[in-house]
C-alpha cells in the first residue's frame, strides 16, 4: 500500500534543547529517524521543522523538508500545515513518525499504515506490553487501555488499569495488563484536516497527550501490538546517553 511519512521535528525542547540535532554516533538524531523511515517502503518522506538548522541537516542527508511555523502545540498540528502546503488528497495515508525515535523499526512504520487501512477508525497507533514495574509507574511512559476490538478507551501517564488487589499488597511486581503506547500515528489527510478544527480538550491539556483530543470528540483510535518492539526514544539527557550506547 502507498503511504507518506511525515516526521515532525520541533527544535525547542525544555528537557533537551535542540533535540533533533543532538549527535548520536556521528549523525544528528533526526537523520537517524529519516534513515529508518526510508526503510519502511513509504512513497514519500517529509521532515516538518521550524528551524533552518534542522532543515540543513536533512537536506544534507538528501531528505525533503517542509518549513513550518514555530507555534504549533502538537506534532499533529504541525502535520496539518504540511498536508495543506503539499496539497495531499483527503484519502492519502499519513504516518506520523516522531523525530525523537532514532531506533524505530521500519517494520512498525508500515504496520501502522496497514492497520489504518483495515480498521474502522480515523486513527491508528501501536503499543507494546509492559513487564517492568518501574515503567508502569513512570509518567513519561504513556499507558493505553483498549476495548475487546482493539480500540482505545483511554491513554494516560498514570498507571492504568489500576490493579487494586495486587497494588494493595505490593507495587514491586505487575501483571500482564499493561500496554505502553508508542508515539506513532497513522491517519488520512482528511482526518488531520478535521483534527485541527477541533478545540483542545480538557483531558488533552491535563495529560499533555494530543491523542486524547480524538477520543474527546468521539472518534476511534485503533491500537495494535507492535510487531517489533522499538528501541528507546529520546526525551531526556539520560535517554540520549542510553541510546548512544545502544546504537554503537
Swiss-Prot record:
It is found in: Cytoplasm. GO terms for molecular function: 3-deoxy-manno-octulosonate cytidylyltransferase activity. SUPFAM superfamilies: Nucleotide-diphospho-sugar transferases. Its main location: cytoplasm. Pathway: Nucleotide-sugar biosynthesis; CMP-3-deoxy-D-manno-octulosonate biosynthesis; CMP-3-deoxy-D-manno-octulosonate from 3-deoxy-D-manno-octulosonate and CTP: step 1/1; Bacterial outer membrane biogenesis; lipopolysaccharide biosynthesis. Activates KDO (a required 8-carbon sugar) for incorporation into bacterial lipopolysaccharide in Gram-negative bacteria. This is 3-deoxy-manno-octulosonate cytidylyltransferase. The lineage of its organism: Bacteria, Pseudomonadati, Pseudomonadota, Gammaproteobacteria, Enterobacterales.
Amino acid at each position: 500500500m502507498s503511504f507518506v511519512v511525515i516526521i515532525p521535528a520541533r527544535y525547542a525542547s525544555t528537557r533537551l534543547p535542540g533535540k533533533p540535532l543532538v549527535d548520536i554516533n556521528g549523525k544528528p538524531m533526526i537523520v537517524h529517524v529519516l534513515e529508518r523511515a526510508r526503510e519502511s517502503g513509504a512513497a514519500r518522506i517529509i521532515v516538518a521543522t521550524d528551524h533552518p538548522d534542522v532543515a540543513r541537516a536533512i537536506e544534507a542527508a538528501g531528505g525533503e523538508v517542509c518549513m513550518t511555523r514555530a507555534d504549533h502545540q502538537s506534532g499533529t498540528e504541525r502535520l496539518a500545515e504540511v498536508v495543506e502546503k503539499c496539497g495531499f488528497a483527503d484519502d492519502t495515508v499519513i504516518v506520523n513518525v516522531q523525530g525523537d525515535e532514532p531506533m524505530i523499526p521500519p517494520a512498525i512504520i508500515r504496520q501502522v499504515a496497514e492497520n489504518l487501512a483495515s480498521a474502522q477508525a480515523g486513527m491508528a497507533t501501536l503499543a507494546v506490553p509492559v513487564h517492568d514495574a518501574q515503567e508502569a509507574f513512570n509518567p513519561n511512559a504513556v499507558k493505553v487501555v483498549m476495548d475487546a476490538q482493539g480500540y482505545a478507551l483511554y491513554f494516560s501517564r498514570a498507571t492504568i488499569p489500576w490493579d487494586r488487589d495486587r497494588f494493595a499488597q505490593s507495587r514491586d511486581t505487575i501483571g500482564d495488563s499493561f500496554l505502553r503506547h508508542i508515539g506513532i500515528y497513522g491517519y488520512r489527510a482528511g482526518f488531520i484536516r478535521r483534527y485541527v478544527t477541533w478545540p483542545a480538550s480538557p483531558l488533552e491539556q491535563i495529560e499533555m497527550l494530543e491523542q486524547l483530543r480524538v477520543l474527546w470528540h468521539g472518534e476511534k483510535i485503533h491500537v495494535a501490538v507492535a510487531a517489533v518492539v522499538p528501541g528507546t526514544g529520546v526525551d531526556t539527557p539520560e535517554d540520549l546517553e542510553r541510546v548512544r550506547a545502544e546504537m554503537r
